[in-house]
Amino acid sequence: MDPPARKEKSKVKEPAFRVEKAKQKSAQQELKQRQRAEIYALNRVMTELEQQQFDEFCKQMQPPGE
């Protein structure tokens, strides 16, 4: 195989490689975005639970006469 033929062959693979790399990058970004949304949702739930527990604690700490 002569050098010009190798060059042409590598040029054919290059666009497919770039497309595959772009797909991987896009999938990675989607995964990161989904994980971030899940973390925010979990944080919101945990904050609400913490507030409920704190309110319950405050009620228990109040003297019965108040």
From Swiss-Prot:
Residues folding into a coiled coil are 5-52
Some GO term, biological process aspect, for this entry: which one?
proteolysis
Q: Which Pfam families match?
A: CCDC23
The effect of disrupting this gene, in the record's words, is: Mice display a significant reduction in whole brain volume, with a particular decrease in white matter. Neurons show decreased, but not abolished, tubulin detyrosination, leading to an accumulation of tyrosinated tubulin. This causes delayed axonal differentiation and morphologically disturbed dendritic branching. Mice show behavioral abnormalities, including increased activity and reduced social investigation. Mice lacking both Matcap1 and Svbp are viable but show a reduction in brain volume: microcephaly is associated with proliferative defects during neurogenesis and abnormal behavior.
Annotated region Disordered: the residues are 1-30
**What's one GO MF term for it?**
microtubule binding
Question: Which keywords label this protein?
Answer: Coiled coil, Cytoplasm, Cytoskeleton, Secreted
Q: Where is the composition biased (Basic and acidic residues)?
A: 1-23
Q: Is the keyword Cytoplasm in the record?
A: yes
| Primary localization class, coarse | cytoplasm
Cellular component per GO, a single term: apical part of cell
What is its subcellular localisation? Cytoplasm; Secreted; Cytoplasm, Cytoskeleton
Tissue specificity annotation:
Highly expressed in bone marrow, spleen and testis.
InterPro entries per the UniProt record, alphabetical: SVBP
Quaternary structure?
A: Interacts with VASH1 and VASH2.
Annotated PANTHER family? SMALL VASOHIBIN-BINDING PROTEIN (PTHR34762:SF1)
Q: Which family does it belong to?
A: Belongs to the SVBP family.
Q: What does this protein do?
A: Enhances the tyrosine carboxypeptidase activity of VASH1 and VASH2, thereby promoting the removal of the C-terminal tyrosine residue of alpha-tubulin. Also required to enhance the solubility and secretion of VASH1 and VASH2. Plays a role in axon and excitatory synapse formation.
The identity of this protein, by name, is Small vasohibin-binding protein
Native organism is: Mus musculus
Classification lineage: Eukaryota, Metazoa, Chordata, Craniata, Vertebrata
